[in-house]
Amino acid sequence: MKILIFAFLANLAKAQEGCGIISRKPQPKMAQVSSSRRGVYYNDDIFRSDVLHLTQDYFLPFDSNLTQYFSLNVDSDRYTYFDNPILDFGDGVYFAATEKSNVIRGWIFGSSFDNTTQSAVIVNNSTHIIIRVCNFNLCKEPMYTVSRGTQQNAWVYQSAFNCTYDRVEKSFQLDTTPKTGNFKDLREYVFKNRDGFLSVYQTYTAVNLPRGLPTGFSVLKPILKLPFGINITSYRVVMAMFSQTTSNFLPESAAYYVGNLKYSTFMLRFNENGTITDAVDCSQNPLAELKCTIKNFNVDKGIYQTSNFRVSPTQEVIRFPNITNRCPFDKVFNATRFPNVYAWERTKISDCVADYTVLYNSTSFSTFKCYGVSPSKLIDLCFTSVYADTFLIRSSEVRQVAPGETGVIADYNYKLPDDFTGCVIAWNTAKHDTGNYYYRSHRKTKLKPFERDLSSDDGNGVYTLSTYDFNPNVPVAYQATRVVVLSFELLNAPATVCGPKLSTELVKNQCVNFNFNGLKGTGVLTSSSKRFQSFQQFGRDTSDFTDSVRDPQTLEILDISPCSFGGVSVITPGTNASSEVAVLYQDVNCTDVPTAIRADQLTPAWRVYSTGVNVFQTQAGCLIGAEHVNASYECDIPIGAGICASYHTASVLRSTGQKSIVAYTMSLGAENSIAYANNSIAIPTNFSISVTTEVMPVSMAKTAVDCTMYICGDSLECSNLLLQYGSFCTQLNRALTGIAIEQDKNTQEVFAQVKQMYKTPAIKDFGGFNFSQILPDPSKPTKRSFIEDLLFNKVTLADAGFMKQYGDCLGDVSARDLICAQKFNGLTVLPPLLTDEMVAAYTAALVSGTATAGWTFGAGAALQIPFAMQMAYRFNGIGVTQNVLYENQKLIANQFNSAIGKIQESLSSTASALGKLQDVVNQNAQALNTLVKQLSSNFGAISSVLNDILSRLDKVEAEVQIDRLITGRLQSLQTYVTQQLIRAAEIRASANLAATKMSECVLGQSKRVDFCGKGYHLMSFPQSAPHGVVFLHVTYVPSQEKNFTTAPAICHEGKAYFPREGVFVSNGTSWFITQRNFYSPQLITTDNTFVSGNCDVVIGIINNTVYDPLQPELDSFKEELDKYFKNHTSPDVDLGDISGINASVVNIQKEIDRLNEVAKNLNESLIDLQELGKYEQYIKWPWYVWLGFIAGLIAIVMVTILLCCMTSCCSCLKGACSCGSCCKFDEDDSEPVLKGVKLHYT
């Protein structure tokens, strides 16, 4: 087949060269191609950096089907395509073209594609980009032609007029020479028409493709925003044809792929330069939705709640009584004469089908107003009876025939009740009703609703009737007007008047839309055991909701229950393991899943699954996508109701080699464990040392909310209206205050479990001597005296071989602590002592890192690294110095060095644990952030919204709208406070547990397995952390186990013997008794057993009652409204500079310092634990011991000298010691001594 082109050269204004005709054009093949992850674009003008952004806009869904169109010429005669049909624009278009010869030249956008409406042309004529919006006479086959590599004809449109936009871009030269080989160019575009602007996004990729659209990820950037202001419903592509002559043009190879945008949610990842580097289509599959729900591209193993679903109705059930008679409305409306208004007449209509559409569609009625019911809904309703009241009044008096009206007619002739349910119909009958008609002009008392007074006087002979003189020549306001008032009696008895709706079959036990006598709803209908009275049509529950109905045809009573509704949970092994997921439809039968839809009534394809081997019912709901194994194993991912899931291979659970998510029943023991089967247990025979890190939060940040500023901003009108809400705001802050008090109480109670430090008595003045410069100040227990600092600042520890080198490196500079870390047997270690300067430095770094992490985008968290490192190094130091724990357990001692590696591995999780604790701290800020986002997205800027309302509406309507905003904000605040209360309860429970562990694990040695770490407890060390405590538990865990046959008791001579401590085990030939946590067999004696009862086995059944969750009673709002919505006055509040939310930061530096000191003293107080090893710690004598020691020496010397002198045994040491008179050798003691003369003896 060959394509022939004929040119029609029309000499029109603004005409191009004419148009061409294509002969024998085949229909497009329209093959489908996957879009993969292409077509993402920058949908707004906001610059974002290093952030994940959730946005809702019109995007091309990932992996959607694109339609392929060709410009193709194969063998010149047989396969020739030039596909340029008119395509649907929809909500936007994704367009991708693969080519090599510049075949694609542009597009035409419009609606009718004729000269009656404007169209937009965006084309490349090989030298310019031309953009025009006009009324075009478009060519049937718009195209460009290229002859011998040169642009020849522009056959796009013949003429144009009424142009409103005309733009020509800068000139260039397009290569129009046909090329051979593979496709070299991939150009992608996105077109969106919003608010009169056509936005164009584009990206270019160099390719080398023989065919098809490449897979991958692409991001398009904005290039044009054109203010066309036209309606765009369709578009078509403008392409070029080629020839070596001036005729017989043929297409060159090119392909383009199109798809429509859909409104969806995408999560975009921006790098630090503001570039989109990745994206997730949140509705693509369960894993994608999960990523958007947790706002993270990486998902850890577990089960996550994503969204809600509701089972959609499958059928519609309409049940009306079997009534065929037509209601006689024609007799009422077409009566020959209508009565006087004071003597109005009533007609009862029953046992008939009422076609109200004839009435409210009639154009002859001047008034058709309904109260308590919509005219368009009457066709779906049934009533016990309908009453038609008729009378004649003036046209101007029709307004008085309405609830709550006053006037001569409403007060003295015809009165409607305030709760009137019905319709008022009136029409002008000036030509038909003429003459005198009467009405009552006055009366002693006003009429009651539907009261009729036929008297003509007031009882005292005074005439009360006046006359209408109707004729067609008076003004319209005084002309005769007929009025029919239809009063509807609501169903309190069987329906007798229904709309002309055809009844359908009754469908039970399925989710359906139902209509019983006008009662509409959605639910499941089931047979009921209730009994109705003969007149009763509906049944109500304690909350006054309709929960049962009588079928008007069979008179059967039916219960109404809601259709299945619940959450959708996604089970994932973690994105690092697999992208495979399973989906749990909570509390729903699998038979309902194919019709399950999301709460917003959308039906993504992934929601609908076909039944098969990977669909099975559990008590938790319908699980889809996981293979069910009929066995019990240790739980990996708990799903609920005793069902667990794992990501396993064939060697573990399955019969094939492929990994898959496997669901199974939860077991108490490990897989194939003999410890829980066949009367056998596993008893440890060997152990290894392990260290477990445990983080226990005990408090959280305190917050308060400035309710008025947060809800109303600077709007005085809103603030005044907020006063009518009573004590809502006060109660919110009262709850937050209670949370803050609870946090202080938690902290106090946790630290109260720690033993108080030993305090020395206050000794400042003793025996008249002032010791204030020598003895420490008892009011400052952490400060040493000058002499203490000078003489006694060292502690002697057992050196495993690294402490001396550390001390030589450290010198007197505490800041070199980490730098001086030593290597010991391949491990980095530090001495297990911290000076006060070191404690202060590390604590400050930790607190600063945690506090600044929130506003430094995580960079501040780097300050926490030294804290984690020194903690790990010091515990390495503790480990290597404890070279002998048990001399009678040589194997444990020998394996200690290998266990140090495990300790290091365990301590590597400390940073992660602290990160979790940081999450506890930041959850409050996150809740506030969520609250702000919720209010921002739902209500916009507070002040601008309120001011806009006040400017557009009158006072009453404005207060109604502001009231809605206040209600929404109060609800958000209430949600936030509820989250805080829940979190506070969790923190309280954690604080209680931390206090217990402080007592049992730190101050003692717990006998509970896995309570203080994983395994059997040896010792624990607390470390302070923001808003919590970090415990490092040293435990020994079984490294080898052996299975033994066991029995709970031994029956001997009709009596049952039970072990006092431990269990009975058998080695195959004999029975022994051994400890449960370590195999140490002993002979069974009366010392380790006791006798109780006989050998009979008594089986008891515990209470297994399962209580249904309580249904809250929905009481009337009246009491609540009476309590809060009341007249309330208050002086104006000066808000000043009070911020909207006061998210205060609690400074617990003193508590952290205190915890450091307490932890140190606790470690020193574990005297009983020193018996476990050979670790020795020598403390130098205090200064007062040294003083006493020196004083004693001095006293001994003085006493010795005195004795020597008194006993004349002084040797004088050749004159070095002069003893005075005690060394004289004069025998005459009576010789006088001359004053001033010194005597010498020889």
UniProtKB/Swiss-Prot annotation:
TM segment ranges: 1183-1203
Pfam families: bCoV_S1_N (PF16451), bCoV_S1_RBD (PF09408), CoV_S2 (PF01601)
Residues the UniProt record annotates as site (Cleavage): R654, S655, R784, S785
CDD domains (UniProt xref): SARS-CoV-like_Spike_S1_NTD, SARS-CoV-like_Spike_S1_RBD, SARS-CoV-like_Spike_SD1-2_S1-S2_S2
Alphabetical list of Gene3D superfamilies matching this protein: 1.20.5.300, 3.30.70.1840, Single helix bin, Spike glycoprotein, N-terminal domain
Residue span of region Fusion peptide 1: 785-806
Region (Fusion peptide 2): 804-824
Modification comment: Specific enzymatic cleavages in vivo yield mature proteins. The precursor is processed into S1 and S2 by host cell furin or another cellular protease to yield the mature S1 and S2 proteins. Additionally, a second cleavage leads to the release of a fusion peptide after viral attachment to host cell receptor. The cytoplasmic Cys-rich domain is palmitoylated. Spike glycoprotein is digested within host endosomes.
Domain BetaCoV S1-CTD, chain residue ranges per copy: 325-500
UniProt key word Plastid: no
UniProt short sequence motif KxHxx, positions renumbered to this chain: 1238-1242
Stretches assigned to the Extracellular side: 14-1182
Topology versus the membrane: Single-pass type I membrane protein
Location of region: Heptad repeat 2: 1132-1171
Family: Belongs to the betacoronaviruses spike protein family.
Domain remark text: Fusion peptide 1 (FP1) and fusion peptide 2 (FP2) function cooperatively and have a membrane-ordering effect on lipid headgroups and shallow hydrophobic regions of target bilayers. They are considered as two domains of an extended, bipartite FP. The membrane-ordering activity is calcium-dependent and also dependent on correct folding, which is maintained by an internal disulfide bond in FP2.
The protein, known as: Spike glycoprotein
Annotated organism of origin: Bat coronavirus HKU3
Gene that encodes it: S
